[in-house]
Regions:
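Glycan-processing catalytic domains of CAZymes
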Residues: 5, 23-375
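N-terminal Sec-pathway targeting helices
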Residues: 1-16, 20-25
Length: 375
């Protein structure tokens, strides 16, 4: 039997190598519980603790996040504490909005420190400075940059001023968030940990996903979506079927945070009615049954715009940085992105060719630049 031993050893080694190689290359099952959060932001004017409790009771079995977006509630430390206690005790994660520091009668830094000790990982972080990019694009009274001679100057000034607002709390809380509908790239250059792309009106959801997700990827950050008004008057919010489709789109596109913006209080639960709660529950059930759908729409294509090009990308004649008119590239950029939406849906990202682009372009199978023809 001895002469056969070397041959047997060779066979065993070969089989072992095959098993090892196969295990390394065999497709791994998707994460059974991908880390993502879905919930409602209660932002009614003069929200009280009873409003918070009512909404928590309504959605706690099919959400895992609650956002306190009513600044009046946060002005009062007692009502804020009562609200957060109730949210936490019902198993939901917490995000709160803080606004102008001079409106608070208590030390907000101290409150954040205590909240993190008290709620642990149940406190996700702070929502700080709403829509900085959107304000720059369309709100003259709130623009950080009122005058600039070049796109480069506007980009630098915008980022510098916004960073000061974000950094006010950067040492007091683990995560800082905002929601926006433009200029994501430059907001991510500050210390925001995640930005929620707004699904608003009839604006292309895929376009905003491409801009927000692309910026997050380039800066090593997270991203999310927030579903806001469809109409400027009642009923304000989209119908239940549209909500379900938006929730599904955000989930398959890989949004870590998915939030429903709820304002004003035109009914017992704000702008939300039974059809919206039914859609939210249906979505929750879908995520539990289909965790493999999370992030299943991959961004395999990238579209790269010039550095510092703060084009709003909401229409072909949108402004640049809110202070410059559209230029010779604007219509082409709009048409290019629209063509990519038609062809790839949410399967592409928008990037900018500055120092933060780096090797991120290597993640994509195909990269188009602004000066190329897209067929």
């Amino acid at each position: 039997l001895k002469p056969k031993t070397p041959a047997l050893a060779i066979i065993l080694i070969t089989v072992t190598l095959i098993i090892v190689v196969a295990s390394l290359n065999w497709p791994r099952p998707p994460d059974e519980n991908p880390e993502f959060y879905v919930g409602v932001e209660v932002a009614y004017t003069n929200t009280n603790v009873s409003d918070v409790r009512a909404m928590v009771d309504k959605v706690k079995s099919y959400t895992n996040l609650f956002v306190i977006g009513s600044v009046e509630l946060t002005y009062n430390e007692t009502t804020l504490n009562e609200s957060c206690d109730y949210i936490y005790n019902n198993g939901l994660k917490i995000i709160i909005l803080f606004t102008n520091v001079f409106n608070y009668s208590y030390d907000t830094h101290e409150w954040l420190s205590k909240a993190q000790q008290k709620y642990g990982d149940g406190f996700l972080g702070l929502y700080r400075y709403d829509e900085p990019g959107g304000d720059q694009l369309e709100n003259p009274r709130s623009r950080f940059v009122q005058n600039a001679t070049t796109y480069t100057e506007a980009a630098s000034e915008f980022t510098e001023i916004l960073r000061a607002h974000v950094d006010y709390y950067v040492d007091s809380v683990g995560n800082i968030f905002t929601a926006d509908f433009g200029l994501y790239w430059w907001s991510y250059k500050t210390n925001y940990d995640a930005i929620f792309a707004e699904f608003v009106g009839n604006q292309s959801r895929q376009r905003h996903i491409a801009m927000c997700r692309g910026a997050a990827a380039a800066h090593g950050k997270e991203w999310g979506t927030i579903i806001t008004w469809k109409y400027d008057n009642e009923p304000y919010f989209e119908n239940g079927q549209e909500l379900y489709q938006d929730l599904r789109l955000a989930y398959t596109s890989g949004a870590k945070y998915i939030i429903i913006f709820n304002f004003p209080k035109i009914g017992p639960y704000g702008t939300m009615t039974d059809e919206h709660f039914d859609a939210l529950k249906q979505f929750w059930d879908h995520t539990k049954a289909n965790p493999q759908d999370f992030g299943s729409t991959k961004a395999n294509v990238a579209y790269v715009l010039p550095p510092h090009y703060g084009f709003g990308l909401r229409r072909p004649d949108d402004s640049i940085w809110g202070i410059f008119p559209p230029d010779e590239l604007s219509t082409k950029a709009w048409n290019d992105v629209s063509m990519l939406v038609d062809k790839y849906g949410a399967g592409f990202d928008v990037l900018f060719d500055d120092e933060d682009l780096g090797d991120v372009r290597n993640r994509y199978n195909q990269v188009f630049f602004w000066n190329q023809t897209i067929a």
